């Protein structure tokens, strides 16, 4: 079913980076959306067992994001919250970040996703430090560089 990441403001960058880490390091499907963007249509795909990470900003609309987390859990989703203050009450898994001002949270809120992507790759028996289909340097715009990979395996 893959993973969904939701965030607002500067944490949207961490959410997008987490999606890339999930795809490149853990070699699993993932989607990153703004929290408000998710609420305008994609929410229709919510099903039992869906895995969602929500980055929280203690100073910007956190109460809305906590309500969303609660609603997702009521629909059977597994919700991970990453942020500061007050998320324990939702019953979701909560990774509390050290206290920093909202403007600087983006510096640290990617760290849990980095650790989790590496761990998921190991649990799945995948090497998070190598690419299966892509060379480290993309040299042309066409295809998937499979010829480069065939040369490596020969």
Which residues does each predicted region cover?
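A SIS-like phosphosugar-recognition module
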Residues: 1-154
């Amino acid at each position: 079913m893959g993973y969904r990441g939701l965030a607002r403001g500067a944490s949207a960058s961490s959410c997008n980076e987490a999606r890339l880490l999930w795809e490149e390091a853990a070699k699993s499907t993932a989607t990153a959306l703004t929290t408000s963007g998710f609420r305008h249509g994609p929410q229709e795909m919510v099903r039992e067992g869906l895995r969602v990470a929500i980055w929280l900003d203690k100073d910007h609309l956190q109460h809305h994001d906590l309500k969303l987390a609660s609603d997702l859990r009521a629909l059977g989703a597994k919700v991970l919250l990453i942020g500061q203050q007050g998320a324990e009450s939702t019953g979701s898994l909560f990774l509390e970040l050290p206290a920093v001002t909202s403007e600087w949270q983006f510096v640290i809120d990617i760290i849990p996703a980095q650790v989790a992507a590496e761990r998921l790759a190991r649990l799945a028996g995948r090497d998070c430090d190598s690419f299966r289909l892509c060379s480290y340097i993309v040299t042309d715009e066409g295809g998937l560089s499979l010829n480069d990979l065939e040369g490596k395996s020969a």
